[in-house]
């Protein structure tokens, strides 16, 4: 079966494992976008460490879960998010003001919406987590 959206598959795997109360989850295939998204999640403490396993194919990622994640998902299609529209997206996707993050891909790399606001840059929306 062909995977259409590897980021959506990865986030759904993490979501399902978190709901079941698992300690670890295996994600395959591995991609740069997934690794950067997981790095943003790890920076904010929603997941633990993750390890990239190179199997000379598509690669695998083993993610340690902390039990802090409530929901994560992908935003499809990847809408353009301007700096002035960031507040509107925040109200639509996140449960409250100081809770959760929207992940954007910008010209300065993949980052959360607060870092994008500090760097004064917009981009395309990848997903969210809280």
From Swiss-Prot:
Note the superkingdom of the native organism. Eukaryota
Q: Which InterPro entries match?
A: Ribosomal_uS8 (IPR000630), Ribosomal_uS8_CS (IPR047863), Ribosomal_uS8_sf (IPR035987)
Q: Does the keyword Cytoplasm apply?
A: yes
* Location (main, coarse): cytoplasm
Q: Name one GO molecular function term.
A: structural constituent of ribosome
- Listed GO biological process terms: ribosomal small subunit biogenesis; translation
What are the GO cellular component annotations? cytoplasm; nucleolus; ribosome; small-subunit processome
> What does the subunit section of this Swiss-Prot or TrEMBL entry state?
Component of the 40S ribosomal subunit. Part of the small subunit (SSU) processome, composed of more than 70 proteins and the RNA chaperone small nucleolar RNA (snoRNA) U3.
What family name appears in the similarity comment?
Belongs to the universal ribosomal protein uS8 family.
Q: What's the name of the protein?
A: Small ribosomal subunit protein uS8
The scientific name of the source species is Ictalurus punctatus
Lineage here is: Eukaryota, Metazoa, Chordata, Craniata, Vertebrata
């Amino acid at each position: 079966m062909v995977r259409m959206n590897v980021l959506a598959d990865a986030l759904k795997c993490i979501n399902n494992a978190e709901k079941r109360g698992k300690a670890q989850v295996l994600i395959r295939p591995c991609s740069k976008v997934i690794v950067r998204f997981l790095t943003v999640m790890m920076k904010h403490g929603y997941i633990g460490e993750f390890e990239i396993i190179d199997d000379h194919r598509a690669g695998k990622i083993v993610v340690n879960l902390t039990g802090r994640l409530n929901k994560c998902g992908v935003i499809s299609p990847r809408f353009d998010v301007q700096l002035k529209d960031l507040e509107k997206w925040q109200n639509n996707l996140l449960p409250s003001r100081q809770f959760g993050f929207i992940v954007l891909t910008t010209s300065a790399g993949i980052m959360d919406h607060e870092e994008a606001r500090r760097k004064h840059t917009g981009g395309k929306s990848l997903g969210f987590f809280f």
